[in-house]
Amino acid sequence: MVIGLLKTLVGSRNDRLLKQYRKVIAKVSAFEPSLQSLDDVALATKTAEFKLRLAAGESLDDIAAEAFAVVREASVRVMKMRHFDAQIMGGLALHQGKIAEMGTGEGKTLTATLPVYLNALTGKGVHVVTVNDYLAQRDAEWMSKLYNFLGMKVGVNLSQMDHTTKQAAYAADITYGTNNEFGFDYLRDNMVQDLDQRVQRGLAYAIVDEVDSILIDEARTPLIISGQAEDHTDLYIKINALPSHLERQIGEEKADGTGVEKPGDYWVDEKSQQVYLTERGHDKAEAVLVQLGALNDGDSLYAPQNITLMHHVFAALRAHTLYLRDQHYVVQNGEVIIVDEFTGRLMQGRRWSDGLHQAVEAKEGVQIQNENQTLATITFQNYFRMYGKLAGMTGTADTEAYEFKEIYNLETVVIPPNRISQRKDKQDQIFKSSRERYDAVIKDIEDCYERGQPVLVGTTSIENSELIAQLLDKRKLPHQVLNAKQHAREAEIIAQAGRPKMITIATNMAGRGTDIVLGGNVGKQSSLIDADSSLSDAEKASKIMQLQDEWQSIHDQVLASGGLHIIGTERHESRRIDNQLRGRSGRQGDPGSSRFYLSLDDPLLRIFAGDRLRAVMERLKMPDGEPIEAGIVTRSIESAQRKVEGRNFDIRKQLLEYDDVANDQRKETYRLRNEVLESSDIGDLIANLREDVLRAVCSVYVPLESMEEQWDLAGLENVLASEWGLTIVLKNWVEGADSVDDSEIVDRVLQLAKESYDAKVDLSGRESFASFERSVLLYSLDSHWREHLAALDYLRQGIHLRGYAQKDPKQEYRREAFELYGELLNVIKNDVVKSIMTVQIRSASELDQASESMNDDLAKLADVQYQHADPDMEVAGSTGDRGAAIDIQPAPLCAGPKVGRNDPCPCGSGKKYKNCCGALT
């Protein structure tokens, strides 16, 4: 009550921001008359003028109003479109590094041109991030006319582009691309062997379109570059037979022994998307595995040597119980292709990790591809947090505003629409069974068809969309289906979806990127006609002219019928996804309507509210086919959705807390790698490493400040000769000297090592040897970093068990990960020094061949796969929504601020940098 009163008196934070923006809009409008009087050349030269003003000390905020006015005027001349005041407000929010929530049809693509142009004036580059290649290319081509008019270069970063083209795209003032490409480019840039191989040039400013989809929905699925690992094809085939021998338990056993409706060998936790063996299931699984030849008789499934086998068992169970064909994946041309849960699109070339994809391939009887080893990985959360300034646009962000602020420090600003929406959102209708629900859906579609109203039916899976299509076929109602199997016709189907009597069935993929225009999208339909090679030029012109003449009457007809009607056949776990479906209707003040038809069989209701609602229906003695339609029921469903959203937020936050540990180590490792790449000669670094390593070796046999009786000189001589390539006589020298202390022995060893090193340099030449040293260090760093990533992954999978010992798993993970990183640095130091000291050199050409060989080995990593990990395997013991596989690529390196020797180490150990990660340098 008090908060509400304060908001009434002083306005909400959103209201105050909009008030500030309106003041800037007045300034933008004030520039308009003078800019209108300029010719095209004079208007375009404003770009050079702005750059000079920035160089003279003015800030972007100082020139923002005039720059926005220039873009608005240029848009009028080039695009024949003038930015609305709402778009100016959205542009200001984006420039300030906030999320602008703007409804469907409000022109987010045009809005972005304002802050993109302004921030591109700095010359540091602006990244415009979209969800797929089609939108990236479309928006770049569409808006490049405006940017080119103003003297800005535009690049497009698409998958499968060659190296030179990518470099050119990143060198442009403005670069459009997908979140996947930007992320994978970052990782690839940190795997290069030469500075010239990098493509990115910095992470200054990014605007993320459909920011909720990228930073929320895909946040839990790390980007992974992986290479071939050990082949376990036969094992997958054997274990695929196991689930058919096991019975599913119905109900979870509680602490008091109740809860099990039907005993079985395993039970499925649908909330956490995990499968667990029961006590009887363990015994039965072991017996079956022995019969299958996968387990030795008498061995336990939990024996240390069978950890990998256990991993395969659970992967097979999850593949058979949780991952469904035509819902989570499709099988095409003998391949298992993942369906993106959030967009409904096929994820060509993307694979689930941790053996899950191979388990699904075994289940479907298709060829099993080899497993992969992680070479580099990062989450979207940590990638996008590296940008100097980050902003985003979407039509549905307010429900996730807390998470955006908590994780990314991004404030959400709700921009008022240019025209108030007239869409009517009707109460949900809930039925006892799916059959009754679909009967009601078909009846609603028939009613709309009879009055000429276009309908968009939203489904959550390919299977459901095809079921509705079959029901409509029986009623002889014409319709279009848009799902991952028909994605190639997406543009054509969406262009027609707003025409009278059109029935469009779509999975979530129809929800983003393209507006449904009432009466049909004339521009899109015209381009489709123009692309039809079967028509002559005269026929094309005639059809396009006819289309334009008919459009207004068709548009008016659709308006009179009530606009686009949205039918949702199921509630999604997230309210935001439901709002996206609703948002397809009522664009720019158009009329429209929406309604969700639900069933007690739906996963959301079954898991969170099914029993309670079923009891209500039975008490009310509701007849078959009669729905519940009440505000209190709709609110209870939204309450269940909020619970799921809260749980998923906790999981994403937990993932981030774990990944932050690896992220600190990743940044430090990449920083070290960059120093090596950027240094013309790392001789001083090698000398420091050599001294550190040999001092440590000597201290084992000749402890510091020890007595002569404690020395093992013979052992030191042997180890230096056998492992470090140094032949030295210490025992006779010590016996013949009057007095020798431990420091003199160390100095003698170091001096001999330096002489040996100098001799190799003299023989090969400084330039050749410097190249060899760089290759050795990069090879060791990259190979051991890959092993370290695997070690961190294994550590994370089991760390939750520390909770049973009353220890904080996250703190334990941080501590042990730091210890592993310390071991990594020591191994790298020893590896590098040993390689350089033991190399036998006969000529400079031999040394060059050795360098090329190591570089070739690393270059083989270019034959890699890009994937998202399955998030349910990312944090063992966690619960969460199912993740999707996704396509991605890498960006440039951010070296970050230089760390002083006495500053706290950025890896989080609490030690000084010089005593921790800085020890390597």
Curated annotation (Swiss-Prot):
Pfam families registered for this protein in UniProt: P-loop_SecA (PF21090), SEC-C (PF02810), SecA_DEAD (PF07517), SecA_PP_bind (PF01043), SecA_SW (PF07516)
Membrane topology: Peripheral membrane protein
Binding-site residues, ATP: 87, 105-109, 515
Cofactor(s) needed by this chain: Zn(2+)
EC number(s) reported in the record: 7.4.2.8
Recorded GO MF terms: ATP binding; metal ion binding; protein-exporting ATPase activity
Subcellular location per the Swiss-Prot or TrEMBL entry: Cell inner membrane; Cytoplasm
Disordered: annotated segments: 575-594
PANTHER family: CHLOROPLAST PROTEIN-TRANSPORTING ATPASE, SECA INNER MEMBRANE COMPONENT OF SEC PROTEIN SECRETION SYSTEM
Protein family: Belongs to the SecA family.
Family annotation (NCBIfam families): PRK12904.1, secA
Protein's UniProt name: Protein translocase subunit SecA
